[in-house]
């Protein structure tokens, strides 16, 4: 069982979503947005840090997943986004959480099945996947999608690890049987 905190960073609105993963089962724990209405960037970053810290304290997540920076048309916007993202990551690291990063395109591909999905499609699929009665706000839905992507990544990694272990076990058994058969310990009955 793991509790995953997903973050959709923004300098004005930072979405968050928290889920619990038990095997393949995902359970919604909470979501929302940290809104920073002040004008100066340092105060916004301070509020993002405080907000993420409060969420970590409240939900006690085991893992922290965040969207990677994408290339924006406006360099100033990209820099502010990077600073907001860094602030959220520092809050996670200060609580000894492992940090995982996912590209927006991968998140959309994982949750919707299309890497170019829009916010409404992501919102709809998050609502279905987590069996929510109401649609979360778009920033929270994006953060939940990031958490879902991380949960999917964990499942995929476990599947691969189990496959590797199974292959190694099969190889060891085959080698053992070949050794014993060649020594005459086993006889094939036909």
Swiss-Prot record:
<feature type="binding site">
    <location>
        <position position="67"/>
    </location>
    <ligand>
        <name>Mg(2+) 2</name>
    </ligand>
</feature>
<dbReference type="InterPro" id="IPR036397">
    <property type="entry name" value="RNaseH_sf"/>
</dbReference>
<comment type="subunit">
    <text>Homodimer which binds Holliday junction (HJ) DNA. The HJ becomes 2-fold symmetrical on binding to RuvC with unstacked arms; it has a different conformation from HJ DNA in complex with RuvA. In the full resolvosome a probable DNA-RuvA(4)-RuvB(12)-RuvC(2) complex forms which resolves the HJ.</text>
</comment>
<dbReference type="InterPro" id="IPR020563">
    <property type="entry name" value="X-over_junc_endoDNase_Mg_BS"/>
</dbReference>
<keyword id="KW-0238">DNA-binding</keyword>
<dbReference type="GO" id="GO:0005737">
    <property type="term" value="C:cytoplasm"/>
</dbReference>
<feature type="active site">
    <location>
        <position position="67"/>
    </location>
</feature>
<dbReference type="GO" id="GO:0006310">
    <property type="term" value="P:DNA recombination"/>
</dbReference>
<keyword id="KW-0479">Metal-binding</keyword>
<dbReference type="GO" id="GO:0008821">
    <property type="term" value="F:crossover junction DNA endonuclease activity"/>
</dbReference>
<keyword id="KW-0460">Magnesium</keyword>
<keyword id="KW-0234">DNA repair</keyword>
<dbReference type="InterPro" id="IPR002176">
    <property type="entry name" value="X-over_junc_endoDNase_RuvC"/>
</dbReference>
<comment type="similarity">
    <text>Belongs to the RuvC family.</text>
</comment>
<dbReference type="GO" id="GO:0048476">
    <property type="term" value="C:Holliday junction resolvase complex"/>
</dbReference>
<keyword id="KW-0540">Nuclease</keyword>
<dbReference type="Pfam" id="PF02075">
    <property type="entry name" value="RuvC"/>
</dbReference>
<dbReference type="GO" id="GO:0003677">
    <property type="term" value="F:DNA binding"/>
</dbReference>
<feature type="active site">
    <location>
        <position position="8"/>
    </location>
</feature>
<comment type="function">
    <text>The RuvA-RuvB-RuvC complex processes Holliday junction (HJ) DNA during genetic recombination and DNA repair. Endonuclease that resolves HJ intermediates. Cleaves cruciform DNA by making single-stranded nicks across the HJ at symmetrical positions within the homologous arms, yielding a 5'-phosphate and a 3'-hydroxyl group; requires a central core of homology in the junction. The consensus cleavage sequence is 5'-(A/T)TT(C/G)-3'. Cleavage occurs on the 3'-side of the TT dinucleotide at the point of strand exchange.</text>
</comment>
<keyword id="KW-0255">Endonuclease</keyword>
<keyword id="KW-0233">DNA recombination</keyword>
<dbReference type="GO" id="GO:0000287">
    <property type="term" value="F:magnesium ion binding"/>
</dbReference>
<feature type="active site">
    <location>
        <position position="139"/>
    </location>
</feature>
<keyword id="KW-0227">DNA damage</keyword>
<feature type="binding site">
    <location>
        <position position="8"/>
    </location>
    <ligand>
        <name>Mg(2+) 1</name>
    </ligand>
</feature>
<dbReference type="InterPro" id="IPR012337">
    <property type="entry name" value="RNaseH-like_sf"/>
</dbReference>
<protein>
    <recommendedName>
        <fullName>Crossover junction endodeoxyribonuclease RuvC</fullName>
        <ecNumber>3.1.21.10</ecNumber>
    </recommendedName>
</protein>
<keyword id="KW-0378">Hydrolase</keyword>
<feature type="binding site">
    <location>
        <position position="139"/>
    </location>
    <ligand>
        <name>Mg(2+) 1</name>
    </ligand>
</feature>
<dbReference type="GO" id="GO:0006281">
    <property type="term" value="P:DNA repair"/>
</dbReference>
<keyword id="KW-0963">Cytoplasm</keyword>
């Amino acid at each position: 069982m793991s509790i995953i905190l997903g973050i959709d960073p923004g300098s004005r609105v930072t979405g968050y979503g928290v889920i619990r993963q038990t095997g393949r089962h995902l359970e919604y724990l909470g979501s929302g947005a940290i809104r920073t209405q002040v004008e100066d960037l340092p105060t916004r970053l301070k509020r993002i840090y405080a907000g993420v810290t409060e969420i970590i304290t409240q939900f006690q997540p085991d893992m922290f997943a965040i969207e990677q920076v994408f290339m924006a048309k406006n360099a100033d916007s990209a820099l502010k986004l990077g600073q907001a993202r860094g602030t959220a990551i520092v809050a996670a690291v200060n609580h000894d959480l492992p940090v995982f990063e996912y590209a927006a395109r991968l998140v959309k591909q994982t949750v919707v099945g299309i890497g170019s999905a829009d916010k409404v499609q992501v919102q709809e699929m998050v609502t279905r996947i987590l069996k929510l009665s109401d649609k979360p706000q778009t920033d929270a839905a994006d953060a939940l999608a990031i958490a879902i992507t991380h949960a999917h990544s964990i499942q995929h990694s476990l599947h691969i690890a189990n496959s590797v272990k199974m292959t190694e076990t099969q190889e060891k058994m085959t080698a053992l049987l070949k050794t014993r058969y060649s020594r005459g310990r086993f006889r094939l009955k036909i």
